[in-house]
Design a protein with these regions (language model features):
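N-terminal interaction/assembly modules
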Residues: 1-86, 105-120, 128-152
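Short amphipathic helical patch at the helix-1/turn junction of helix-turn-helix
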Residues: 99-105
Length: 152
């Protein structure tokens, strides 16, 4: 179960890390391409050399993720369970859902982590390992953010 004790302090650093990860992944093919979205995710890459500008664009990134929630869910549907698309999109989609569940929402109670159990049950056959890996990655980021939060 995730530790939400330092979630508020971790939020800022996690945003920075998530933005940095997205910028680093640009050009590798490991990113989401929204056909009907506003394109805000791509805006982050325009200011990769300026931390202030990156942080200013995090809001756009969050807005895009929120408004495209149905599309994110579609990414882990049967439509993407084959071939290259599965490898390209599934882990990223799982991470975005975890981001929505554990970071974007203001969760006060650790029992809210049960939502992850529902998600895992729904996609158990294919995505359990992917979601576990994404959850572990998010836990590690929160732990690192907690350790560094006093510097900010």
């Amino acid at each position: 179960m995730l530790d939400f004790y330092n979630l508020e302090r971790a939020r800022k650093l996690l945003m920075i890390k998530s933005t940095s990860d997205y910028i680093q992944s640009k050009g590798t093919g490991d990113k989401l391409n929204y056909e009907d979205g506003c394109g805000c995710l791509s805006h982050v890459t325009r200011y990769s050399d300026n931390l202030t500008s990156k942080l200013a664009n995090v809001y756009c990134q969050q807005k895009a993720i929120t408004t495209l929630n149905d599309d994110v869910l579609a990414l882990i549907s049967d439509k993407y369970k084959s071939g290259h698309s599965r490898k390209k999109y599934s882990k990223k989609a799982a991470y975005l859902i975890l981001y929505l569940v554990f970071v974007k929402e203001d969760l006060k109670d650790c029992d809210k982590a049960n939502e992850l159990g529902v998600l895992k049950q729904h996609y158990k056959e294919y995505h359990e390992k992917i979601i576990d890996d994404a959850c572990r990655e998010l836990q590690e980021k929160l732990a690192v953010a907690d350790a560094l939060a006093w510097e900010y």
